[in-house]
Amino acid sequence: MKALSADSFLARSLAGLTVAVCRHPRWFFWPQAVLFMVCVVYALPRPYGHLDFDMNRDNLVGPDQRYHQNYLRLQKEFTQQDDVVVVVESDNIEKNRQFVERIAAKMQMETNLFRDVFYQQSLVMMGSKALLYASETNLVEMKTMLRAAQPFVRQFTQTTNLVSFFEQINTAFRTAPREANADTKSLIQALPALTRIVTQAIDSLQRPGTPPSPNVIALFDTSGSGVLSNYITFANGRIFLVTTHAPNAETNGPTVDQQHQRGRQTQDEVNGYVIDRLRQLVKQTQAEVPGLNVGITGMPVLDYDELAQSQKDITLASVVSLVLCALIFIYGYNEIGRPVKATICLVVGLAYTLAFTTLTVGHLNILTITFVPMLIGLAIDFGVHLITRYEEELRHGKTEAAALTKAMVFTGQGIFTGALTTAGAFLAMTLTHFKGIQEMGIICGGGLLICFIPMMTLLPVMLLRGRQNVIDHRATEDDTRARIENIWLQRPLLVMGITAGLCLAAFWESRKVHFDYNLIKMQSPSLPSVVFEHKLLDSADKSLLYGAVMVDSLTNAVELREKIKQLPVVADVDPPFYGDFLMDQSKKLELVGQIKQEIASFQFNPADLRPVDIYELSRTLYGLYGYLGNALEEVGNSDPDLTGQLVSLRQAIENLRKVMLQGDAPMVAEHADKLAQFQQALFADLHDTFQLLQHQDDSTPLQVEDLPPALHDRFVGVTGKFLLQIYPNTDVWQRDNQEKFVTALRTVDGNVTGTPVQLYEYETLLKDSYVNAAWYSLAAIALMVLFHFRSLGAVILSLLPVVIGTLWLAGLMGWFSIPINLANIMTLPLVIGIGVTNGIHILNRFAEERTPGILSRSTGKAVLVSGLTAIAGFGSLILAKHRGIYSLGCLMATGIATCMIAGLTFLPALLNLLGRWRPLIKQPSADNSPSTLGQEEPR
């Protein structure tokens, strides 16, 4: 290793820069002050500035990947966005139904935000061909049910409000014969429906908001499963769902938020408006139907929440990192002025970097959003090393200009090389095939070099000002760091042995380290969207994520669907109705015609819009209460089931009368308005349902063109391709399940795509890219160190602390069962780039002075302080609730610490041991010899 020279091109350049700074300080101060302000304004987030946030993971992957091209073709063919899901959970099925009915009604009023709101199998949604989607068996059952319910339904055709309806029921009870006949049987079958109507009327009085209909299908369902079969439910009705999706930003974005008139909105912005508004509607509906566990989830919500949480985490981490680094700097040097000056220069560099990011990349993503606390911990090192050497030279009696020149020329070379090596570790990421990692390399690598500029131009200007310069001309007492360092410098063989033992132990423990691909585990476990995603994963019999296959023809779609359904990893394939378009529908058409005949005579009058006459309704219900009592006496104990139904209806009537009559006159009037809303919902639902049944089209078979818009847009593409949605029967967030599912689907269709495929390839590419980036970083760093020292031995020596520190880190991960994941794998290239700088600075000073003592000199102190600031920078990420960012902070802080310890203990001991055998370099020049001015600080 050759001695460090002041005659190299780099040294002469740094010397010239120092002269310019000393002679023309204003040239370096005011232009940068103006540039700082410009950069801050330019790099403000939109809509105030030009910086965007892109949290779409699909955009992290380059378009040249085949699997991603398949996904882009899918998005181009099927422009509908991913579903946003409202999850309603409780053990009360009726409250769940009430909630989804109410919130769906609110969502359907805001069509500019919520598209294709789906929460039940509605005849209205399916249109005039709705019955042709049902099986022949179901059509026969419907025909039988409608025939049996005719006497009860006719009561509604002859009434317009609740009073007249219950008067009709009273008449039916009063005129019912003792012996059983068709009318009596129909009346008995209507008892559950009557109970449901009365119970729902009570509920409408006790809840705020507009009451929904009791649901016509459930009224006439004799099996008792009408509610569950008519809604989207899981876990036997414990969970109800409402699905919707945001408008497409390319066609509908500008109309989403009328307050923003700044041009076309991104899809992330549109999704944000939808999610925020939906959460407001959830809160409003919870006030109407309390006592439920309600949240929203889905891929857009998970991404949106991840962005919001990451922004909060990074903001907190950045502030904490900046404060900690400044405090460490201040404490380490027992002064405030210079650390504050270095911190100011750091802030200037960060502003430059933000502007650079905005200009070159244009946005931050889920990977690059962490760059600010990273650069805080790394770029402050430039100032630490420069200030430390500057102070040392002042204490050796040099003038301010001479001290600054010595620091800039000699320590500056190490700072420059360290900046290049760390930046090289980042820039090597641009050689990968993962767009998100390439952007990380550009931002962090370029940012480090940019932060180097104010540290080497603005900081020297500020260092030449201040009273601390006078104080530092005084002599200082010997530092205890020299005595501490002698503990291992005088025992190099013992240090070698301990290091080897720790490495062996670490290697043994490192075998326990595994890779965790699960992205859902990286998010904050307390986020509601994550909590409800887990609820669905635990309760659903199939995954919510699906694979996707595009098919050119209907025949091929039906054949491929049947083939895919045979795969053992597949739970279901949607849609189920492709086969209906190809089958013989003559029998179905005949049954639909018969159903229409059954109800052809039904004619419903418009519902009464006036407030309900509470007292008249009470008298009518009291009459029904009496008739039910008579019926109970007639039945006696002969039919327990019928007795139970009569008792339930009688009790419900008694409760309704109590509730609607309680309170003063204004309260009763409010009840009258509420019941009017309820009767309007009930009669409108009946009218719309039977009118739709009467107008079912039985003239022609079902065609693709007959699909309602919500289903047509989902399953038929813009060029006529057909979509198959393939649902796995396992949790495909788990890597093993994911791999089995994707592999199985590719045996059927090599172009299969969808979220599981995207996740599988995304995770694979991300992992491989970071591993490759680590190798690229290692190669680039080795070349730069070789160029700097012109010695292969120096390259090996500078990399030894990195190798040892990384091995210790792996051992600690195995000991504490910490897995590698898709966030903390970034540690691989970063630890190499950051850790090697310690070796460079130590070897730089060793080449200058030919003595292995480092900690007692300014270089050792600077390495220690810069290491602590880097640990603080990355360690601040531990405060994050996002578990991926948290784990990155843990590993980076630990990795930097282990590399620093190895650099400050093992490397000097090794240099001392090697120096005993043979001199490594020539005697330094006279200019670099230790000064003898009075009592000195050890160098």
Describe the residue ranges of each PLM region.
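Membrane-embedded transmembrane helical bundles of large multi-pass transporters/channels
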Residues: 1-55, 66, 72-73, 249, ...
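Membrane-proximal extracytoplasmic
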Residues: 2-319
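Solvent-exposed, non-transmembrane loop/terminal regulatory segments of multi-pass membrane proteins
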Residues: 44-91, 97, 151-154, 217-231, ...
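Short flexible coil/turn linkers enriched for glycine and charged/polar residues
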Residues: 80, 236-238, 421, 541-543, ...
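Short proline/glycine- and acidic-rich turn/helix-capping motifs at secondary-structure junctions
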Residues: 120-129, 576-591, 757-763
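Short, low-order "capping/linker" segments at domain edges
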Residues: 128-145, 585-601, 765-775
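Extracytoplasmic
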Residues: 174-335, 629-777, 781
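Charged, amphipathic alpha-helical linkers/stalks
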Residues: 586-653
